[in-house]
């Protein structure tokens, strides 16, 4: 999973959609914040340079055709699994 910065938006975002830049050029992202309380949907994540808490319940669809963005980092496989499980848990009931 890639960590990106989106033009005109503060902070970092974690791309949680499977195909980051597929034919639709859209991505589902979750914001990353530096400080908030931890709970099952707020998961710590870090790359080589970026560290924060992913707010899994705040997913957004972003059309990257109309927004500037840049890739800044990536997270490990184990972090990816934890975040994917949390997001999947939102929809399992």
Identify what each model region corresponds to:
Residues 1-93:
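Conserved functional hotspots at enzyme active or ligand-binding sites that engage polyanionic ligands
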């Amino acid at each position: 999973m890639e960590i990106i910065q989106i033009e005109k938006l503060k902070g970092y975002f974690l791309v949680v959609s499977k195909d980051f830049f597929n034919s639709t050029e859209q991505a589902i992202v979750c914001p990353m914040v530096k400080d908030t309380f931890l709970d099952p949907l707020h998961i710590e994540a870090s790359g080589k340079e970026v560290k924060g808490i992913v707010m899994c319940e705040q997913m957004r669809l972003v059309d990257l055709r109309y927004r500037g963005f840049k890739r800044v980092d990536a997270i490990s496989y184990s972090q990816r699994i934890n975040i994917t499980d949390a997001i999947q848990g939102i929809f399992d009931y």
